[in-house]
């Protein structure tokens, strides 16, 4: 704990954590106007979506992703929009965009980079948690590279090591 505190101290004043329970993307935009961040993490991005006025939930999620992208462009910041995978991804190591929860194409269309994280299927009788993870880069407008990186999750430090 003391090492973490020492490492955090120099950046503490530049990191803001906001409770966004019940908030929408308009609130996110107002926070960006007020604080002018370089990086915004939306965990879970889908929870900021307003479903009113949309015929289907996937349309609301697409509109939400579009709003997040516009915030990134207008406020010159990187927006990390966390989302969940659907049940289609359960037990699979190789993942693709169609396995996104709720919006199979709408959210993906707005992303510059998509990294989907998989873990090994459960093994019957295995008591120990499997820490192997598979980072699937399924969309990459930044460098063009697509593929998988197999790594270990160090849960004590929340780091992936390859």
Give the ranges of each region predicted by the language model.
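Alpha-helix capping and helix-coil boundary motifs
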Residues: 1, 24, 53-59, 126
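Cytosolic-facing regulatory segments adjacent to core modules
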Residues: 1-36, 50, 148-150
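Flexible beta-alpha connector loops of hexameric P-loop NTPases
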Residues: 16-18, 49-62, 91-98
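Active-site-proximal loop/turn and secondary-structure-junction residues that shape catalytic pockets
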Residues: 21, 46, 85-87
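Helical hairpin unit composed of two closely spaced alpha helices linked by a short loop
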Residues: 38-78
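Phosphate-binding/switch region of NTP-binding enzymes
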Residues: 64-162
């Amino acid at each position: 704990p003391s090492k973490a505190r020492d490492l955090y101290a120099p950046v503490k004043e530049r990191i803001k954590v906001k409770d966004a329970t019940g908030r929408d993307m308009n609130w996110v935009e107002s926070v960006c106007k007020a604080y002018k961040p370089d990086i915004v993490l939306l965990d879970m991005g889908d929870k900021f979506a307003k479903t009113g006025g949309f015929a289907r939930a996937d349309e609301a999620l697409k509109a939400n992703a579009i709003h997040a992208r516009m915030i990134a462009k207008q406020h010159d910041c990187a927006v990390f929009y966390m989302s969940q995978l659907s049940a289609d991804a359960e037990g699979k190591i190789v993942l693709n965009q169609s396995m996104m929860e709720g919006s199979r194409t709408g959210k993906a269309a707005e992303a510059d980079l998509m990294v989907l994280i998989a873990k090994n299927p459960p093994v019957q009788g295995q008591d120990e948690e499997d820490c192997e993870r598979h980072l699937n880069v399924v969309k990459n407008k930044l460098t063009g590279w697509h593929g998988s990186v197999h790594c270990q999750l160090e849960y004590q430090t929340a780091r992936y090591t390859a």
